[in-house]
Every structure is written in structure tokens, then in C-alpha cells.
Amino acid sequence: MAEKEHYERTKPHVNIGTIGHVDHGKTTLTAAITKVLSEKGLAKAQDYASIDAAPEEKERGITINTAHVEYETEKRHYAHIDAPGHADYVKNMITGAAQMDGAILVVAATDGPMPQTREHILLARQVGVDYIVVFLNKTDLVDDPELIDLVEMEVRELLSEYDYPGDDIPVIRGSALKALEGDPEQEKVIMELMDTIDEYIPTPVRETDKPFLMPVEDVFTITGRGTVASGRIDRGTVKIGDEVEIIGLKPDVIKSTVTGLEMFRKTLDLGEAGDNVGVLLRGVNREQVERGQVLAKPGSIQLHNKFKGEVYILTKEEGGRHTPFFSNYRPQFYFHTTDVTGVIELPDGVEMVMPGDNVTFEVDLIAPVAIEKGTKFTVREGGRTVGAGVVSEILD
């Protein structure tokens, strides 16, 4: 048994999720995957009801219902998210509560692509989910195979419209319900789907292999030694002797060298993604570093004022605004560890944004911040969260 456990840890880990229109079978498919893999000893079977009764979680001040399911294939370990309601999907994808490396787009062959099919594809594109595998569900309910071909063509065209390789994306046809009920042919289809996901969705670059980035939370001076910036390492690794840049909130970038590293008041050889560390910076005085800046590997991230964001605006019930807002609205954008005021410009044809909407708009920040496509932020007004977003495009 001990050997088996060791083996499981060496499998690469991938985050995926089911997306698609309501009632097209996302949760049924999730349940079917766990059932079929459980028969091979690679998962715990979870029934529809237990997945559908997704627990509430809070992510950046927003309540989201999400079911987290784990399973393995021969090659990999997967964490799979499934959300019961459409609003939960939108919030999940925008807040990054569940960062997906790839997605299974579920489309019912009986309906073809529907409004939320399109919306989920757009969201996946905006938040940086680069790989999609399609599961055409309920094919047992369509008598004419030509109709299924037609639906597949529509789905491929829709994916191409949002810059996915629609012609090349794998499409698997089947019935999640039949697989869940134990139909041997459909169980084979589920295995085929999992093999396809293993092959098509690449293993993500591990957080520790990405360039070093640490948002600064606190700054203090150690007499006789210098200035220490502390925070949680977002990605990458850092060690004594590394060159770093101090970036954000001011027009100039300061270069420094790491001369000391501490965690829990003990010295540390190497800090890595997830660690809360204090970084001693050579030749930097207390006034040159502040909360809200980042320490980063030189050249890995730039300062920007203008960006396009994909944003979910909280409802009144979620503690958000009670009224709509218009272009030139000036809230604070909380990036990394600090608030920066920004001016919002709504897209043509969008008069106003209501609480509960998700929307793409342009932002012009009054101070430059170290951001890139995929950086998460919250929108705040007087300290309370009114929205959550992700940078979908840099504009300057």
C-alpha cells in the first residue's frame, strides 16, 4: 500500500472543469466520470445529488457554490470543478476560485449550442482557459446521425469564432446518463473521453517553474542589515543572490539583490510559490518599497495603467451595489495587496452595468501597477467589494 501512495504523488496534477448550458448534462457527466473511474480503482464514485449539492465557498468576498471532485487516470491526477448554477460558473471563472487548465464543454445533441454555451466559451477565452474538449451528450436521444454531425459542426464553428482551433478540437459523442446507469458501450465512451483529456490538455507549468513574483504586504527595517519586504510568493522561487525588481505604483523600477531570506523567523535557502517570506533587499531604503508593489524576476512583468477586464459585479444580496453604474465610474481596483483608483469605460452599446451582470470594460488606473493578462483583481468602493475581475488584455 505504501508504494501505491508514493506512486500517486508522482502523477502530474491538472485542474479541469465542466462548462456548458444549463441541463445539458455537466453534472451527470461529472458523476459518470467518477463512477467509471471508480471501477478501475482510480476514483471514489460520487452520485449526481452529492455533486449537485455543491458547498458554498467565499472567494475574494464573493459566495460561490462549487463542487470539487477528484479522480485519476493511469497518467494523471485531476481536480474537477462543477458548478450548479450559471451565475456560479461566471463567478468561478472570473474570480479564479478554480483556475482551470482545460475544460470539458458539454453540449446536448438534442439542443445544440445554446446562449450559455456561447457565454462559457467566451469566458473561458477571456480568463485564459486555452484547451477545450467537447462532449456531445444525449446522442442516444437523436435518431438521425446527420443531425448529430450538424450539431458538431455548429459547436466547432462557435469555438473557432472565439479563437479556439475549432477544426482540431476533439469531440466525443455519448450519453453520460447511460454511462452512469452502467451501459458498457457508454462506459467505454467515458474512458475514451478521459484518454482524450490526458492527451489533448497539456500538463500545466508548475507554479514553482514560473518566473518569481511576490506581492509586497509589509516593509520593515532591520537595523544594520537593511530593508525587508514580506509577503506570500505568488509563483516561482527565490534564493539569496537573486536579482529582483521592485515594481508598481511609481514610474521607475528599482533593481536589487536578495541578501537574506526568512520564513517563520528562521533563515531559508529557497523560498517557493505559497511560502510567506521576508526578503532582505540590498541597497534599498525603507521609503523605496511599499505595500502593493511586487518583487519580481527582472523583465518578467511590466507596469501598466490601461487594461481590459472581464468582471462580475456583485448583486445587492451579495453585499454589492444597489444601483447601476455608467462610464467614467471611478472605483478602486485592488491588485495584489493594494487599492488603486481607476476610471471605467464601458464598451459601445453598453449604457450601464447592473448589479449581478458580468461585463468587459476598459480601465485607466491613476498609478501604474505590475499586471499581465490573467492578473486577478477586485473592484471596491469605500473598502467593500463590489466586483471581481481578471485582466483579459493589456492596452498600453
UniProtKB/Swiss-Prot annotation:
GTP binds at residues 20-27, 82-86, 137-140. Residues 61-65 are annotated as: G2. Its main location: cytoplasm. Residues 20-27 are annotated as: G1. Residues 175-177 are annotated as: G5. It holds the Pfam family GTP_EFTU_D3. InterPro entries: EF-Tu_GTP-bd, EF-Tu_GTPase, EFTu-like_2, EFTU_2, G_TR_CS, P-loop_NTPase, Small_GTP-bd, T_Tr_GTP-bd_dom. Residues 11-205 form the tr-type G domain. It catalyses: GTP + H2O = GDP + phosphate + H(+). GO terms for cellular component: cytosol. It is found in: Cytoplasm. The keyword Lipid metabolism does not apply. The keyword Cytoplasm applies. Mg(2+) binds at residue 27. It comes from the Bacteria. One of its GO terms (molecular function) is translation elongation factor activity. Keywords: Cytoplasm, Elongation factor, GTP-binding, Hydrolase, Magnesium, Metal-binding, Nucleotide-binding, Protein biosynthesis. Residues 82-85 are annotated as: G3. Its EC number is 3.6.5.3. Monomer. Belongs to the TRAFAC class translation factor GTPase superfamily. Classic translation factor GTPase family. EF-Tu/EF-1A subfamily. GTP hydrolase that promotes the GTP-dependent binding of aminoacyl-tRNA to the A-site of ribosomes during protein biosynthesis. This is Elongation factor Tu. The lineage of its organism: Bacteria, Bacillati, Bacillota, Bacilli, Lactobacillales.
